[in-house]
């Protein structure tokens, strides 16, 4: 049962991720709210992670990096 749930989750993530690659417009990174009780300034810069086969993605989130590894291309927005 857990295997089925896991597979359904992975397939739905892949479909959503694949759909993002063909949509027009770049939505950019999402800023996160600072945790309670934090001390000092918190950086809101997007996480920079190069993914294999995805050299056009310079600053992407963890989800988009996972999508790049899965499909071998940038999933945020295709330019041109």
UniProtKB/Swiss-Prot annotation:
Pfam families: Penaeidin (PF05927). GO terms for cellular component: cytoplasm. Induction: Up-regulated in response to V.parahaemolyticys challenge. Highest expression at 6 hours postinjection of the bacterium, then gradually down-regulated upto 48 hours postinjection. The modification Pyrrolidone carboxylic acid is found at residue 20. It comes from the Eukaryota. One of its GO terms (molecular function) is chitin binding. GO terms for biological process: defense response to bacterium; defense response to fungus; killing of cells of another organism; molting cycle process; response to bacterium. It is found in: Cytoplasmic granule. Its main location: cytoplasm. The N-terminus forms pyrrolidone carboxylic acid. Coiled coil: none annotated. The keyword Acetylation does not apply. Strongly expressed in hemocytes, and to a lesser extent in heart, muscle, gills, intestine and eyestalk. Lowest expression in hepatopancreas. Disulfide bonds join 54-67, 57-74, 68-75. The keyword Signal applies. Residues 1-19 form the signal peptide. Keywords: Antibiotic, Antimicrobial, Chitin-binding, Disulfide bond, Fungicide, Pyrrolidone carboxylic acid, Signal. Antibacterial and antifungal activity. Presents chitin-binding activity. Belongs to the penaeidin family. This is Penaeidin-3. The gene is PEN-3.
